Amino acid sequence: MKFLYIVILSLLSLQFFAQEKPDYGKIGVRIADESSDYYYPKLFGRYIAADRSLTVNDFRYLYYGFTFQAAYVPYADSEYRGNLAVFFDKKEINEEDLQQMIKYGNLILKTLPFDLRALQLLDYAYYHSGNRKKSDDAEFKRKMIIKAILSTGTGLSKNSGLHVIDDLHKFDLLAEKKLRYNGVQRIANNSCEFMGVFENDKNIRGMYFNIGRLYQVSAERLKGQ
């Protein structure tokens, strides 16, 4: 079954539409419209249920639409992330460890529903504890979030930066592309950051990430909007 979903996700990538920057104004209007297919409570319910009929476009509305929700806090992190650190240093993971990973992974997702690291962890923990359905659900969500982000640009120039709503997602996307961050980070323009990477076979010196939405929401919250 796990192999089947990997095949399905690969086929989805063949239907990938042209890269397009998120239109936050349009997203905000549609997710607030109760008659829209993108009405956020309804769409988010489908996400929680890991509805396989959700498309990359649906995930664009889910991911970027989250920034319009009161639950979204720019630059927030989970208090439970530290509880998982111990497991990354263990040579062997037992059943009790798996259950703890599941517990804390789900706690992270309660406040950060698009946390790629928690989803990857749950994919692993559920798979090795024998719950293939929940493992596949976590993998589906993570892969589709990544596809949604990659649909926003190439990441190879400041005018085509990948739009992220979570600062950690810059590092997650580098890892997804098998690029290692080299510690170089600089502002490219008023909404884009450059992240340098070590020498690689792709001849990529670094990637650009558009974090303008984090800035915007932070500013709006400070003004009390």
Identify what each model region corresponds to.
Residues 116-117, 144-158:
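Boundary/linker segments of alpha-helical solenoid repeat arrays
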Residues 80, 119-122:
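TPR repeat positional signature
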Residues 109-110, 143:
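A conserved position within tetratricopeptide repeats
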Residues 97, 104-105, 138-141:
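Alpha-helical solenoid repeat scaffolds, predominantly canonical TPR units
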Residues 1-23:
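Bacterial Sec-dependent N-terminal signal peptides
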